[in-house]
């Protein structure tokens, strides 16, 4: 069978069924086989087709009305990302906080109290080291006990680990506390995009997964506001209060997630069909969807991916799943190669560009607020224009701006060049959250097979940390006065790596906008070239 042909737009958008399919659907309209564990695919296939067509034909607003609670629970799960965001930005801001530098730093005759380059980098990578371990724990844990309980477990451990950070009296203890805090971060970041992409219909997958980037921005806003307020404060209070604020989040989130429904896709994978139906009913309005048909749609996809053995990490690197794994890993890793490190180190970047500490903190807060606004704008762009389109155009603009940053940093130390470097740093940090960053979360949530999703998102985030950890050392060295002292000239470095990522994405990143998980599975199996996904047609009856 040919894998691609010219698209009939009308037929594709309406997903019109053949007379045979219509007759089959009416013959099984009582949904009798949908929740029958012994039923074969042929018994419930017509209902599965009906549910998939219903999702395809939903508009965005209609999808929100049909699945209001799915939107809410995706919001709650995404909120867990605030924990990592808050702490990452907190440690990055602490290296510029006078009270923190005075307590934990060394005295430099030129710059006053400073945190040495080695300890700056160590503090910035410590949480990521823990998270790298955490993402490998997340996959097997989630496959066994589900997204909810794995995340709740992480939240409870996080409460204890914050205690160590709060009472730390030395940089080595802070380093250890951050590694421990990173363990639950790994669970949150691996589970959130997978859970969010599984509980919403097709039209809501983009905004549901992009909420992760929004909460990342919110975490940085909170940190920016708190550290700006406490920047002039003397003594331990200046950093103890920002640390203690972390306790606001874990317990309320754990309670809410205890009340949340489990992913129906995970329940279907476990053969718990009645529970899956209950979960679907809690996620959507029963008056607007047929619950048994929705479960049948999930069963059809799970059956296509069926394997008698438990999912394992080695499977991620076999056959077509290797390509899917590489896309997820690439989308994650590229964030650190296309401007993310400038965004994460915004305050320190502004300070090294020549701005006063108070101005740097204020500009960092403004940057975070603009990122939050631009993330919400990205929901519209990615939903209607597509993931590949936004990712490629956003990355191209990002590369141009990074090169411009390098040029601005090369023309001298005048006020004009300092202002240009600061302005471009702000623009790069903000536009990164309009294009490549939020599009990445959608790609990560959609690409993997349902069966291997917890493992794939975990290994993908691991690639993020594996790339980020050495680059944090490099980035700190490039900016630090006792290191490379490049300032804006670091734009040349990240512009070069960003260009490489753009070229790779152009040839290998497919467009998955508007595709059901069945269609995505089939298109990967047929090895359709990435640039032809947008025009490929998959028949509603196809299972392979």
Where on the chain are the PLM-derived regions?
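ABC-type ATPase nucleotide-binding domains, specifically the catalytic core motifs of the NBD
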Residues: 284-286
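Alpha-helical transmembrane bundle of multi-pass membrane proteins
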Residues: 2-281, 303-544
